[in-house]
Amino acid sequence: LDPLMRVGPQADGHRKPRPTERRRGLFRRLGLPEEAERLYPFQLSGGMARRVLVSTALITDARLVIADEPTPGMSLDQALEALTMFREMADQGRGVVLITHDIDLAVAFADRVAVFYAGTTVETLPASDFQTGPQALRHPYTKALWRALPQNGFTPIPGFQPYAGSLPPGCLFAPRCPHRTPECEMAPPPARELRGGEVRCIHAT
């Protein structure tokens, strides 16, 4: 947000005529008080600022919205409302890319999920596979994430992600993988299609 502009005009953008009523409706849905439109960014809490930013994305007719961690600082109800609005955009045929560490929220609202490890996509899958359980997942890291969720036993993943400057030569997850073989450490595995998704693991079946 521009620190020198009030947040109402920022959310409206350069559209003419100004979509004031539409923006006020979005503010209400996101739990922002009416007077928020007259405030400057420094007068907002972190959660309020994120809700203003969400409204700037929703007020447009953009064909693609990329939302990077849009919900931290929001209450659960506010986060659910924001994600419901993104879901409505997707149902209208627009693209929404949600970047988040909150697996439960992502799985609840997404059509497909891409799992990253050390900056690389290790698996893409239908969100419903994550809800099914580890037998529907493909990559050992994705399965480890599933087991690390509180409702699935909160089992930690041993070890640490590699630093960007010291990546292993083969599979990035191999040093932490209980199923690794010497082949895993020879070269990065290519992405391949498997059971309606894509995976970077030579042993995935």
Predicted stretch roles:
Residues 126-205:
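Short catalytic/signature loops enriched in Gly
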